[in-house]
Amino acid sequence: MTKLFLPMSVLVLFLSHGMATPIHSFHPDTLSLPCRQKAEQLLDEALRFMEKNYYHRELVDWKDLAAKARQQLLKADNCDDAYASITWCFKQLGERHSFIMPPDKAARYNGDEALESPSGLADLVGEIRGEWLTDSIAYLTIPWVHSDDSLVCERVADSVQAVIAGLDTRHISRWIIDLRNNSGGNCWPMLAGIGPLLGDGVYGYFVASGERIPISYNDGSACQGRHVICRVSEDHGYHTYAAHKSIVVLTGRRTVSAGEIVALAFKGREQTCLIGEPTAGLTTANATYSLSDRSVLVLTVCQEADFAGRICDGRIQPDQFVPTSNTAADPDTARSAAIAWLQSK
């Protein structure tokens, strides 16, 4: 699958519990040929995807990288060390956002395993919380989403819009959106959920090889180009009472990847202010590629731009820097600053 999503930074996203797996040595005196062939195959698959799709592929000497990665594999101690060799490749590229997802994590992320209990869903989605701070100011958190399962994504989008609808009154015209603990994952349910506060329109772009693909929201649907990636279960999305809203987005060092895309969707808009600390700086987009052992290569394939088409390179800087604090006098200075900014409007 090559549908873009933002991990995580993950994402970043990402052992399993159960019986131990036997270790197969790669050392020549005890070498298991099928094991080594499997590892070499996985490395070759990953390198082919990287050479074809990596967003800075033209800057890489792929023959040299492949040769050195295979040398790394010869030093391996077990069959799973193909993953270590792939990770080594990313380190040589200076790549912080790409990674390899083992089969068990990939199955859970893609929804291949049944969510048998609420605790299972809680492992995939962060907290969604809302409250009134004053008669005119509402506050909500947008969760990280470590799943690509369509049902999970729909439930997240529904839940966020339900929180917004529950907070919305004719007197609420000012909102605080807290992304400080949003560690990323899948941006689409976040965007579909927060859509009532964005309104319909284009709010960013994926940029690669001179091409710009719009990121937009329209009546309950989050779209990549012309394709609906996530939407709420109802025929239409929620619409707030107030057409014109003042909004503060709280950001911090734990605002990562997909969380950063949500922050970028709001940055630079009228009557909107980002307050807090700079984000993590994983402002690139990833695509996923399945490998033969059912692991998944999560590969950075493009950059991100804001609604005006300006490329975001690295950390998103807040409009108003407020360092994290936790004092008895003021346990949340960033939120206090957000309230003050909104009350000045």
For each of these PLM feature ranges, what is it?
Residues 234-246, 253:
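A conserved mid-domain beta-alpha-beta active-site/ligand-binding segment of alpha/beta enzyme cores
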Residues 318-345:
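Low-complexity, Gly/Ser/Thr/Pro-rich intrinsically disordered linker/tail segments
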